[in-house]
């Protein structure tokens, strides 16, 4: 079953369900990609920092292109610029490394992964002696200008942002000659992001939800935190529609035209996650799921300082999550 699409302002069609690859182990991700492509996925979400683009490239090389199972023009591939590569001189080399690893001539979408820059170099998490991150003063508006040059060169079809606040999006729009097409953020019924989605849609950006199932596999999970997949309303709808709780959460998103990139390396789940286009919730059922919102953000980069877990970047002037949305 192919996923339905949204139309980006660039004219590109972006499938509403893609395969996420964050936390997909090398050794597993190649088979996951190949399986996903055989069951109808046409959207793969990648990032340099995930450390698995080389293996994803092997899967794409075997499956995508002239005379192979999937024509390149049918596939939508996203990747992301890491924080150590924000300096304008580093942007194109970073993209070219991603393209080489993925064995692609162009990306359909390239996102700035976070608004703030880390110190330049090959260490992805440069640190001070006390364990805090070493930042770089490059502003995302300057990085954006360097990203725009990649579109002019035909290396990237569309640009976007990840983990930016509404204010930061407007800041980019104020200098952009190539407008961002997509914002990727954490989003699920506990963090519905209604204001941010409305903000984006009013400005011609589509929204992609990462961790759409609540990321229960994250390393720092607090055992006392609520579990989205176990919510009674989710369970009740799963029973009513004879679906899994995951399918209920994904259907809620695609029904509000939010793109989802659930990660899995398990074939049965990969298949299940795309089977969300043959049932529809009533407006009342959508409201029941909307009511789960508690602005609960799970994905906040953390550090251990003096034995305590603290948000790694919260003191940075460009930290996005200090803004209301």
From Swiss-Prot:
Record-annotated site: Lowers pKa of active site Tyr: 80
Pfam families associated with the record: Aldo_ket_red (PF00248)
GO biological process, one term: aldehyde catabolic process
Keywords of this entry: Acetylation, Cell membrane, Cytoplasm, Lipid metabolism, Membrane, NADP, Oxidoreductase, Phosphoprotein
Protein's name according to its UniProt entry: Aldo-keto reductase family 1 member A1
One Gene Ontology term, aspect cellular component: cytosol
Lineage: Eukaryota, Metazoa, Chordata, Craniata, Vertebrata
Originating gene: AKR1A1
EC number(s) reported in the record: 1.1.1.2, 1.1.1.372, 1.1.1.54, 1.1.1.19
Sequence similarity: Belongs to the aldo/keto reductase family.
Sites where the protein binds NADP(+): 11-22, 45, 162-163, 211, 213, 215-216, 263-266, 269, 272-273
Active-site residues from the entry: 50
């Amino acid at each position: 079953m192919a996923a339905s699409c949204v139309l980006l302002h660039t004219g590109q069609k972006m499938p509403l369900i893609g395969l996420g690859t964050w936390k997909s182990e090398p050794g597993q991700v190649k088979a996951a990609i190949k399986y996903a492509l055989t069951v109808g996925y046409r959207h793969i979400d990648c990032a340099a920092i995930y450390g698995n683009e080389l293996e994803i490239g092997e899967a794409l090389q075997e499956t995508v292109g002239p005379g192979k199972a999937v024509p390149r023009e049918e596939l939508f591939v996203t990747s992301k610029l890491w924080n150590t590569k924000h300096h304008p001189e580093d942007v194109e080399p970073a993209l070219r490394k991603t393209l080489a690893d993925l064995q692609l001539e162009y990306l359909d979408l390239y996102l700035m992964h976070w608004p703030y820059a880390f110190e330049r170099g090959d260490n992805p998490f440069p640190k001070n002696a006390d364990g805090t991150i070493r930042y770089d003063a490059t502003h995302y508006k300057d990085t954006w200008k360097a990203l725009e040059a990649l579109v002019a060169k035909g290396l990237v079809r569309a640009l976007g942002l990840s983990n930016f606040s509404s204010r930061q999006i407007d800041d980019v729009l104020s200098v952009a000659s190539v407008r961002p097409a997509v914002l990727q953020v954490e989003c699920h019924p506990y963090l519905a992001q209604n204001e941010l989605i409305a903000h984006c849609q009013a400005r011609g950006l589509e929204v992609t939800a990462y961790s759409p199932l609540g990321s229960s596999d994250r390393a720092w999970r607090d055992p006392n935190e609520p579990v989205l997949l176990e919510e009674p309303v989710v369970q009740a709808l799963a029973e009513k529609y004879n679906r899994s709780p995951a399918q209920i959460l994904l259907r809620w998103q695609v029904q509000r035209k939010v793109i989802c990139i659930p990660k899995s390396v398990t074939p049965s789940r990969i298949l299940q996650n795309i089977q969300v286009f043959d049932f529809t919730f009533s407006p009342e059922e959508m409201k029941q799921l909307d009511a789960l919102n508690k602005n609960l953000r799970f994905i906040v980069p953390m550090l251990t300082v003096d034995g305590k877990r603290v948000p790694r970047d919260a003191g940075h002037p460009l930290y996005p999550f200090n803004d209301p949305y």
